[in-house]
Amino acid sequence: MEYKTPFIAKKLGVSPKAVVRIAQQLNLTIEKNKYGHFIFTQEDVDQMLEHHRFQIEQSQNSQSTQKASSNEVEELKTQVNTIVQNISSNDFEQLANQLNTITRRLDRMEEQMQDKANDVVTYQLLQHRREMEEMLERIQKLEAALTKEEPIYITPDSKPTYEREKKPKRRKMIFSIFGL
């Protein structure tokens, strides 16, 4: 008997693409009918069912090993907690003191970095101010040189240029037709 991909997919509980993938993994010879549909034999279906059941069993076994590993993690956590509780209070105080000294050093270093950043910014501002003053001096010197060299006489026009230009008068249409 011949079976098509959708029937096998329903039987296995997977998608039709998964059926084709399983057939390729098992190196089954897959035939196609004249419409391009895959056709499987009863032997192919049996092999795919066995393979699928085997994969399901493996996934269940891996889940049980994951549960066992999570139990081991919980045991390790309890061991760490007991070790931490067994540490003497003297050791705890020493660790707290070391932590305090480290935080103080970090605070001092942050303040020093902030001071250096402020110094750099003020230096840059002073440099920019000095450059601006030099530019102002140059501009003033150029203005003085221009006033000495070339006296500029600007006479305001009584009318703007667009009003001064006279537009040619248009002749009347009748005159232009007769050439007058």
Swiss-Prot record:
GO terms for molecular function: double-stranded DNA binding. GO terms for biological process: asymmetric cell division; chromosome condensation; chromosome segregation; sporulation resulting in formation of a cellular spore. Residues 67-151 form a coiled coil. InterPro entries: Chrosome_anchoring_RacA. Keywords: Cell cycle, Cell division, Chromosome partition, Coiled coil, Cytoplasm, DNA-binding, Sporulation. Residues 5-25 bind DNA. Its main location: cytoplasm. Required for the formation of axial filaments and for anchoring the origin regions at the cell poles in sporulating cells, thus ensuring proper chromosome segregation in the prespore. Binds in a dispersed manner throughout the chromosome but preferentially to sites clustered in the origin portion of the chromosome, causing condensation of the chromosome and its remodeling into an elongated, anchored structure. Belongs to the RacA family. This is Chromosome-anchoring protein RacA. It comes from Bacillus cereus (strain ATCC 14579 / DSM 31 / CCUG 7414 / JCM 2152 / NBRC 15305 / NCIMB 9373 / NCTC 2599 / NRRL B-3711). The lineage of its organism: Bacteria, Bacillati, Bacillota, Bacilli, Bacillales.
